[in-house]
């Protein structure tokens, strides 16, 4: 109930909620630490310990990304510690991953794998773990301009890493020139998980189309209603039977968004909704059990699930705009044409600017072709897997991150 009331307050009085949840913590953070913080110079080699603060124990895309960063650095022999701040920042700790004990003050590197509002809240609560450390903010954003409320966080970081060029450009527009903004994509290992349709009640004779998203990341941005419309357009012209699976989380925190999705689905027998957290193993199994991933998102900072689907050898149909273009091309995915429209987000998370409206008819036509043509679908999946393996494999990204920590630069850095 408390989470639902909080969501209602954000919809009805976003400016007041911003003042309470972001501006007041920013003042507390400055009073406790910001006024005396000094930038920590880059060393020729990264100081130890290296701490990755993030939502390691939470069932969130941000948590998955933080866990991937830790695994990537550890694979290079780097001594790295995962500090789980999930419960400190209001998220349930559902996975026994990461250490909940705050690190001590003193030399080292702190990679804060959370966006500025959460970083400010964490520092306002307890600045000691950041004392004396080189702080790298790992941030992601889905629009062409970052919120003005992010600006106070720039004083607390010595460098910024981002998952895509799209996010890099958004942050560079707002960041002081002293701050390097480096593109360090999420590592995406090639999946070896075996499919098991019986585990989820999926028809073995159907082509399975998956659309998965967090309702807290807003229904407007993830745009599943357009995905549903495209699927209905596709199955009206296909010869093969197909099922659309919506895998969601966050329905309890975004009940109005969940209700809208349920209303749109209605009593359709070829659409399934799974609205519950899955273990990492179950989530990977669900992805392995599908044939096509469909994402008519209006914007993505990176699109981790899209990259994971490609790594699993799945055909992907996705809006051809924003962060996913870093690793998607016409031969490795279906890039759906779009028009840019003004942002309209009833959940109040995204305000101002423009984002993409995918061409639903074009998406439906492409989806129908993939449903009916096994050879076409499988060939695209193989090309996608090869491309992601070459560009986003853990050793590739781990080496890049290690270079950044050791003081080297890259072409995509400022």
Label every PLM stretch briefly.
Residues 394-414:
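C-terminal alpha-helical cap of glycosyltransferases
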Residues 2-114:
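N-terminal pre-catalytic "stem/leader" segment of glycosyltransferase-like enzymes
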């Amino acid at each position: 109930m408390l989470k639902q009331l909080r969501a209602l307050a954000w919809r009805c009085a976003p400016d007041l909620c911003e003042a309470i949840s972001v501006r007041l913590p920013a003042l507390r953070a400055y009073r406790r630490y910001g006024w005396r913080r000094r930038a920590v110079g880059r060393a020729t080699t990264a100081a130890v310990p290296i701490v990755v603060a993030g939502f390691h124990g939470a069932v969130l895309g941000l948590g998955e990304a933080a866990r991937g960063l830790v695994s990537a650095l550890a694979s290079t022999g780097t001594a790295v510690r995962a500090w789980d701040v999930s419960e400190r920042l209001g998220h349930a700790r559902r996975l026994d991953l990461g250490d909940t004990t705050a690190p001590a003050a003193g030399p080292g590197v702190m990679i804060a794998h959370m966006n500025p509002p959460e970083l400010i809240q964490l520092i306002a609560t307890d600045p000691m773990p950041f004392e004396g450390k080189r702080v790298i903010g790992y941030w992601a954003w889905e629009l062409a301009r970052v919120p003005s409320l992010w600006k106070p966080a720039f004083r607390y970081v010595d460098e910024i890493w981002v998952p895509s060029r799209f996010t890099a450009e958004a942050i560079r527009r707002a960041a002081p020139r002293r701050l390097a903004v480096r593109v360090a994509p999420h590592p995406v290992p090639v999946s070896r998980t075996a499919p098991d349709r019986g585990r989820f009640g999926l028809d073995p004779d159907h082509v399975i189309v998956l659309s998965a998203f967090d309702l807290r990341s807003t229904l407007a941005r993830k745009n599943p209603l357009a995905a549903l419309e495209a699927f209905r357009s596709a199955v009206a012209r296909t010869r093969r039977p197909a099922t659309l699976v919506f895998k969601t989380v966050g329905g309890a925190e975004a009940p109005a968004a969940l209700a809208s999705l349920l209303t749109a689905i209605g009593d359709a027998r070829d659409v399934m909704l799974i609205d519950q957290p899955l273990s990492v193993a179950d989530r990977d199994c669900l992805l392995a059990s599908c044939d096509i991933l469909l994402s008519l998102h209006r914007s993505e900072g990176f699109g981790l699930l899209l990259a994971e689907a490609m790594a699993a050898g799945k055909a992907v149909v996705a809006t051809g705009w924003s962060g996913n273009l870093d690793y998607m091309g016409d031969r490795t995915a279906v890039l759906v044409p779009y028009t840019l429209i003004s942002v309209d987000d009833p959940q109040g998370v995204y305000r101002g600017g423009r984002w993409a409206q995918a061409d639903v008819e074009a998406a439906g036509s492409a989806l129908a072709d993939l449903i009916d043509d096994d050879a076409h679908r499988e060939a695209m999946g193989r090309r996608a897997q090869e491309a992601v393996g070459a560009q986003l494999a853990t050793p590739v990204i781990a080496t890049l991150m290690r270079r950044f920590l050791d003081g080297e630069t890259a072409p995509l850095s400022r």
